């Protein structure tokens, strides 16, 4: 798979293009007197060093771009790499099956769990089918149906958050978008099973929170979590979306800042160059964190679990 490089990654892209060119020449003519292998290796080492340098000093806006990267792994990618025996469940039993939310029963190291997550698309048709990862009310009602099923069968709930926000269309509002989100917030706060939430890309406003109330809340290193997009904030405060980089810095949308504010528990490191550069390695790190979180929560009684979750919610806003 050829990589898509963002604007701030162009120096890396130029090096990678040189590497690809030399590699192609070497394959076409193995009788060349010049030892291209050594040059290719030198350029690869230089590319790694340059990538480390660039990614060591990323701003909030650059992280936001990475969180939206078109090749970034989505919920179904992590399900494929981390879980076994996934059986997808569909529909809210009231209106429709919202493809922007996927969910179902699977096994994590042999243990039954309920998985729920936002799902974006990659190709144009798939993006439209998934509504660009923006759920309607029926999506959140489907999620709640699966959570209640998990509680009934004593299965831990694992959610993956990756959405620009809940769908703001007229139809969604008419069908009770705000009510669906509010109901999820209320019900998730009292479910009597462990809930682990992980922001894997964009964590946009109430659309993210609707599956984001948990006993453990994690973020991938280059994911974001905010009440509004940087562009939306800039449009309100400065009347121009061009101020999005400034808004991103001011909003504190990145994982280290949110951990500092005690809004999340863990920042999960990503492979060099972000998650899409090495999906299996990213999935392995995420799996290890999920297992560690489950081990911690398994030691709590139902009452302790609920009390801890309640205190967590009440402490939001206090540093």
From Swiss-Prot:
The keyword Lipid metabolism applies. One of its GO terms (biological process) is fatty acid biosynthetic process. Its EC number is 2.1.3.15. It is found in: Cytoplasm. Pfam families: ACCA. Its main location: cytoplasm. The keyword Magnesium does not apply. This is Acetyl-coenzyme A carboxylase carboxyl transferase subunit alpha.
